Amino acid sequence: MSLEVGKKAIDFLIKASGKRKNLEVDFFGGEPLMNFGVVKGIVEYARSIEKEHNKNFRFTITTNGILLNDEIMDYINKNMHNVVLSLDGRKEVNDRMRPRAGGQGSYDNIVPKFQKLADSRNQTDYYVRGTFTHYNLDFAKDVMHMADLGFKQISVEPVVADPAEPYAISEEDLPVIFKEYEDLAV
């Protein structure tokens, strides 16, 4: 997305929001950090006009963490109300579903960054979001692994995929999934 399209989206949101004061903008999909200059430009633009329109913007960003560095973490901590960190759990699970462009896994690269970011936010206003698939129906182990890494805010959700995909969840998987949720509730 270009900065101009982003500005038009902010203008549309302000106009369509009527008398609502609090507005939320979430940066996600693809990888927002690949277009970080545009993210910053949109935040700056929204901040520059929010008082004029009696609005209060809250921003959230979702990232796979590959491009996170200290400068970006500092910006996120100052400008993003919430941050969603994509991690699917155990190393072998995450690396299977989230390989880097060259095919190598991302786990070893992102986990220390995610831990640093979560700690810099005092373990609040973030969450680690995992996706479970047919490949890791034992996802309660992934939740426990993420907790063992020190994360306090954890969410896992089922994959949404074409049923023909080998990682898609099927109706036959549901009893196992229900059991995993029961195990987490204990």
PLM feature segments, named:
Residues 29-30:
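Short acidic donor-binding/metal-coordinating loop in glycosyltransferase active sites
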Residues 165-186:
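A C-terminal junction/extension of Radical SAM enzymes
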Residues 33, 100-104, 168-175:
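Charge-dense, low-complexity intrinsically disordered segments
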Residues 3-26, 35-161:
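Radical SAM/AdoMet-radical enzyme domain recognition
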